[in-house]
């Protein structure tokens, strides 16, 4: 009887747990065969370590195979997912034929790792990261064209790796990375970001925000309502139906040539305010700079964001090419430098080179504020010395000790430290665009809890930490990041552009690595969307880079992994984020291509395409890529006072949507600057020459789709 009862209990146990028992019985040789099959599949695309099946389980009628993280580096697409399932199914013993197969890696099934942008069936029920801004931060009113299937009303935070910084343990300024192959990473990544990537994104309609100075111009002019520290620059006001008044609270003031521990120029002055009108006699504020020498200068404005701020403050920039107008949404971005554009200015002070702000608006009774205007990039003005509290260890971005002091979101200015003297403070003596983000953020009025988490003890760690925290400060108060205080800018994504270290003993290429992080903030963004969207972003950008480089330059270009790892820049931002390691700046085989400006253009365009694909997918939009530059340009005199420009479009074999339908032609006369352009339908343009003209320049047409 006891034997029979024991036998019945054994049968019951077997019936309760048949799947687990069968799963554990998957033979070792079958697991190894599946791993080898996945290895073979992966190495068609990616350089990856051995893939193995770590464990097996059954959920209902589903057989789950859990592969290690190397499997997650495969760029999964619907076609290769189907091939993988077909191939693995063929390797399973017959007794598993009744189960539905699911292969999992990186805590997801492999079909879930197909980026949403590349799925044939769009699941509109899945949460996307798609913040809605009624109006973007800055809109160029004078532009003859607004992209409709591009990046209009999108805000992108990005940065170009490291920069010149103060190393307190050596009491000197230095590069964060080594000099090699005629460059250093701190400058090398700028050769992609500033001349290529940022203009591509802006031409597609995006507002691009950088935590480093973007202007290579070493001169800088500050014009402010509180007076100018140097030169003969002038701030003036003209009152119409409404009067300017002193704003309540703090604003910018330029009180000293250099700034030290935690000093914030945006907390040392005042600002001006006025009510808006819809029609009538407008009031204006004017900033008239004294330009030190003729050249190109970036123009930044500043203001304060108030509860009733206008979302369409009208700025007009007078420059060598005429006038260009912008509408700035002052409901976001107050208390820092906001970039408008880069323009040509003549040396000296005159009414043809100035910035004007009007109180004309689409709505009556709102508030427009006016503070300082910054023209040019300038030289570094943040002075550093060893902290009274000493220095701390230079931890790597991926160091697990950084997890113990992840930024909490408590963004505020500390009480300013007043040293007994300024002896031993050192300026960088470098152009500001060379400096690390930590110093630009101080000059830009960002709270010191953002740019100096170490409280002044370690600029190395502060620099890489501040970039991610800065993203959260930009987005703080918006729907993207409603729980933190900040600038209310609905940032759509963040991107860190790095080059990597590492060498090979032969002519092998190190190649392209993507890094993202999901295991933070409960694996969700504020709107409930999954942080695995950062995986999608990483996959799309890496895939575009590798495909384009293999097609146009090097068929053996190495695709490295997609690391889901806790790098500070990837972990901290509360928006979809990718950290790119494009290539190894230490490896000759990589830098054979990396020093070629044509290669840099191709890579930057690939990054832009990946961003465009990702962002449009979040809004369930079709995307259109900006066409390639035109060629076969020719200029013909059609009569004594008329000239015709002709050109031919260039087909993009890598992108079927990049087809030119319209063009923008820019013109400059004599030694002036280019105008705002005119939109033309065909591939020719005629214009009448002004009387007495000595020289005319017509630029390569900007391509529009």
Placement of each model-derived feature along the sequence:
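A short beta-strand element within beta-rich, extracytoplasmic domains
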Residues: 283-307
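Short, surface-exposed beta-strand/strand-loop-strand elements in extracellular ectodomains
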Residues: 305-323
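Pro/Thr/Ser/Gly-rich low-complexity, intrinsically disordered linker/stalk tracts
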Residues: 616-657, 703-705
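Extracellular carbohydrate recognition and processing domains
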Residues: 320-349
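Residue-level detector of conserved catalytic or cofactor/ligand-binding positions
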Residues: 694-704
